[in-house]
Each structure stands twice: as structure tokens, then as C-alpha cells.
Amino acid sequence: MEKKRNISMAVIRRLPKYYRYLAELMDNDVDRISSKELSEKIGFTASQIRQDLNNFGDFGQQGYGYNVKDLYNEIRSILGLDENYNIAIIGAGNIGQAIANYTNFDKMGFNLKGIFDVNPKLLGLKIRDVEIRDIDQLESFLQEEKIHIGVICVTKSNAQDVCNTLIKNGVKGIWNFAPIDLNGADNVVIENVHLSESLLTLTYLLNGFN
């Protein structure tokens, strides 16, 4: 399926939730589901779900709903998960180690190829058989390995330099957990993840119930 280029970011950010929920339905041997049933489970309106999916094709049938497996596979393809992606993690602190240890990424086709840090106490240790290397080796590693996604888990002051090194050596996707929005080239996709934003959303909602 050819992806459309004018899809709003709001729609794109809803797709992983559809994908995750459809996977749960498949695990529970559910064969089909209506947009109304999806709405009740996911929290989006049925109309919103239909509009989102119609951006990519006509997947549902009147009176039948959606075939769960077919829709799951379509969204998997839309999300680019028919491909495998090599990733490198820069920063082996708590966040970096948590990401490295998350085995579900393997199941989705994300292959951990390298982990880098500056802390001499961490160098040489292994996380799931991947050795933590000195960050001074990052550039030569990137020149030898085809890395699709760099995961940045370093300090705010070092994040942009790491990002620049990744981009200079051909990495096209940056998943950034440093508390700063990074700048990149036009042909590079950067996803800045600020963990505090989710927490502050929670405190806002909690405050509304007090």
C-alpha cells in the first residue's frame, strides 16, 4: 500500500494505538469488530476511527465491520513494520538500559546493534548480549554498521552533538529521550520524547477530579 504524504500528525499518532489494540484482539481470537466496538474500547469516536482509517483505504464493510487480522496487517504495513530496523542506543543509564531490555522491540523488528556510554564502569558490560562500548567508538561503528534509528539517552548538554554525529553518519531516524528538542536535517526524522509531558497530563487530569 502506498502511503499518503498529507496525513495529519494527529492521525499518525493514533495508529499505534489501533495497532496495539488489534494485536490484543487477535490474541483473544476475535475475528471482526465494528468501529463502534473499537470506539468503546479505545476511546475515540466511531466516526473518528472511520475517518482515520479511510485516509489509507477502504478496510471496513457495511454491516460487517473490520476483519481484525486484515486491519492489523494493513496498519502494520502503514507503520512500516514490514521492514526490520537496526538501532543503536547512546546513553546506557536508566532509560537507555530500560529500552535495551525491552524485548518486545525485537518482536516488532527493531534489532539492537549497539549501546554506547561514557561511564567507564559500564563499558564492557552486556545487555542482552550487546556490549556497552565507549562513545568514542560511535562514529567508526556507524560507518561499519547500517543503523536506521539512533536512540539518544544522554544529558541535555550532549544530546545535540550526539544527534549531529548520528546524522553525519547516515542515521535517518532519531528517537530522543534527552530533555531538549533536537535539530536535524530535512531528510532526518526526529521524535522528541519528553517523559514529563505525560506525567504533567496526568496531574492535570488528577486536579480536575479533586
Swiss-Prot record:
DNA-binding region: 17-56
Cell compartments where the protein resides: Cytoplasm
Main location per the UniProt record: cytoplasm
InterPro entries recorded: CoA-bd, NAD(P)-bd_dom_sf, Rex_DNA-bd_C_dom, Tscrpt_rep_Rex, WH-like_DNA-bd_sf, WH_DNA-bd_sf
UniProt cross-references to Pfam families, sorted A to Z: CoA_binding, Put_DNA-bind_N
Subunit structure as annotated in this protein's UniProt entry: Homodimer.
Transmembrane segments: none
Function as written in the Swiss-Prot or TrEMBL entry: Modulates transcription in response to changes in cellular NADH/NAD(+) redox state.
Gene Ontology biological process terms, A to Z: negative regulation of DNA-templated transcription; response to redox state
Binding site for NAD(+): 91-96
Signal peptide positions on this chain: none
Assigned keywords, A-Z: Cytoplasm, DNA-binding, NAD, Repressor, Transcription, Transcription regulation
Protein family (similarity comment): Belongs to the transcriptional regulatory Rex family.
GO cellular component terms, semicolon-separated: cytoplasm
GO molecular function annotation: DNA binding; DNA-binding transcription factor activity
Protein name: Redox-sensing transcriptional repressor Rex
